[in-house]
Curated annotation (Swiss-Prot):
Its EC number is 2.4.1.227. This is UDP-N-acetylglucosamine--N-acetylmuramyl-(pentapeptide) pyrophosphoryl-undecaprenol N-acetylglucosamine transferase. Its main location: membrane. GO terms for cellular component: plasma membrane. The gene is murG. The keyword Transport does not apply. Belongs to the glycosyltransferase 28 family. MurG subfamily. It is found in: Cell membrane. UDP-N-acetyl-alpha-D-glucosamine binds at T15, A16, G17, N129, R166, S200, Q297.
């Protein structure tokens, strides 16, 4: 490695869950090494094609090579496709004169891990989920520098570093930002605020239950900001956007830090980023894990729930009756909310981006 210039290739993409920590790690590397040369690698069809350039990073792409989980023709084609992707990855690493590869998971990472191993380029990995993905399980076999967002993640050589997140979130002072955030989001400064989100893709079952709970929430003096997800506005019986006293819906909020500052209680899915961010900033939460997949979201929520910073309810049990029984009394109890906030914040990690940057520097110094 040239002492004057560090070349880092960052691999990952497909979803915001991979891209957000990648961008946070990149920003932290720029802080500790202002002369660093950064190149992100993703696929041509993922969200990274929009988010990475918007963050001021150069993006290279390679072919997407999913691993079939059942016997099929795609499984027979896998060796050839993977070999082609590894060649593409190798050319990218060579052209970048890469000193280190940082992978955050996703289809793009496996070929890059294999290409880096052949070139004896150090590999640094971040795993965002409680259950590690296949690509990072492969990469961890070749790496001594593996960071995980959740302490219980089983991955070879893992160190618990937390979830790298945007500085606007990790540096948030909820109390100091509360007034301005509520003003921005159109919320009353004095009423308790429930903010509901299903994530970037929305959550129709959550939306339905909240719509059926609005009268009870309003009668209890609770205001609700409902972030429905793009293209998923909640409609009334006449096909118009639902309206009610103390209720406002938007499809999307750009900047979750304002949501975290304004809310007394957050209700949503238990994606890795949401769970880690709510813990880091110390916000009480109700998690409704996504009822599909391998139960990963329920595992994500386990830590904050056990610590007393969050409640969890399965999707089928999340009904208007549950809202009346659990959420309304909670939002009417400031002392309990404050205790949950303290428990949540005690569990959170705000400097995961810097921890990962230090891991990268450690890898290249070996």
């Amino acid at each position: 490695m040239n002492a004057e210039s560090l070349s880092v290739v960052l691999a990952g993409g497909g979803t915001a869950g991979h891209i957000s920590p990648l961008l946070a790690i990149a920003a932290a590397l720029r802080d500790v090494r202002p002369d660093v040369r950064l190149l992100a690698v993703g696929t041509p069809s993922g969200m990274e094609t929009r988010l990475v350039p918007a963050a001021g990073l150069e993006l290279a792409t390679i072919s997407r090579v999913p691993f079939p989980r059942r016997p099929s023709l795609d499984l027979l084609r896998l060796p050839g496709r993977l070999a082609g992707a590894v060649k593409q990855a190798g050319r990218i690493l060579d052209d970048a004169h890469a000193d280190v590869l940082v992978g955050v998971g996703g289809y793009v990472c496996t070929p890059l891990y294999l290409a880096a191993r052949r070139r004896k380029i150090p590999i640094v990995i971040h795993e965002a989920n409680t259950r590690a993905g296949l690509a990072n399980k492969v990469g961890a076999r070749f790496s001594h520098h593996v960071g995980v967002a959740f302490a219980g993640t089983k991955l070879r050589g893992a160190r618990h570093v937390g979830m790298p997140m945007r500085r606007e979130v990790s540096g948030l002072d909820r109390a100091a930002s509360r007034h301005a955030a509520r003003e921005l989001l159109g919320l009353d400064q004095h009423k308790p605020a429930l903010i509901v989100t299903g994530g970037s893709s929305g959550a129709q079952s959550i939306n339905r239950t909240i719509a059926a709970s609005l009268d009870a929430l309003a009668k209890a003096g609770i205001q609700t900001l409902h972030i429905t997800g793009k293209g998923k506005s909640v409609l009334d019986g006449e096909g118009k956007p639902l309206a009610a006293d103390g209720y406002r819906q938007v499809e999307y909020v750009d900047g979750m830090e304002n949501v975290y500052a304004a809310a007394d209680l957050l209700l949503g899915r238990a994606g890795a980023a949401t769970v880690c961010e709510t813990a880091a900033v110390g916000i009480p939460a109700v998690f409704v894990p996504l009822p599909i997949g391998n139960g990963e979201q329920a595992l994500n929520a386990a830590g904050p729930v056990q610590a007393g910073g969050a409640l969890v309810v399965d999707d089928e049990s999340f009904t208007p009756e549950w809202v009346s029984r659990e959420i309304i009394p909670l939002l009417s109890d400031p002392a309990r909310l404050a205790k949950m906030a303290a428990s949540s914040e005690a569990l959170g990690i705000r400097n995961a981006d810097r921890r990962m940057a230090d891991l990268v520097l450690e890898a290249v110094s070996k």
